[in-house]
């Protein structure tokens, strides 16, 4: 059994500005993130990114897809301390232009493999909602 979660937001900024922040993969817009250490460059498939959160949680993300054409990136969490309570987690962030008003629609999806605890899924949901709100704040000001 797997669990799929989608969170999204329209951000009042052009796609190029939003994608520049997302594709940097430093999560600088997200107040829960203390630091990010990257290997092999941030936009290279196979590169890893050690994300340390303010609460002490450390997760290692591996980039499995990166597309400038589609303004999307996919990463999997390959390590987490403390453990997440799921067998695996894959996340995708994709940005779409909204041509009617030059804004950007951002969609952040997560797929949790079998045995995914509802606590882990719920936690990811609220963290993504908060991160999208903070991304909007970072680019709309």
Where is each model-derived feature located?
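Hydrophobic ligand-binding cavity/cleft-lining segments
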Residues: 1-44
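Short beta-strand segments
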Residues: 5-7, 57-61, 104
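Hydrophobic/aromatic beta-strand elements that line small-molecule binding cavities or substrate pockets
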Residues: 9, 59-65, 89-98
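A generic beta-sheet turn/junction motif
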Residues: 11, 54, 99-101
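Hydrophobic pocket/interface hotspot
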Residues: 18-22, 49, 63, 75, ...
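Short amphipathic alpha-helical signal-transduction/dimerization elements
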Residues: 26, 129-140
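Glycine-rich portal/gate segments that line the openings of hydrophobic small-molecule binding cavities
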Residues: 29-82, 141
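Beta-strand/loop substructures that line and gate deep hydrophobic ligand-binding cavities in soluble
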Residues: 80-130, 141
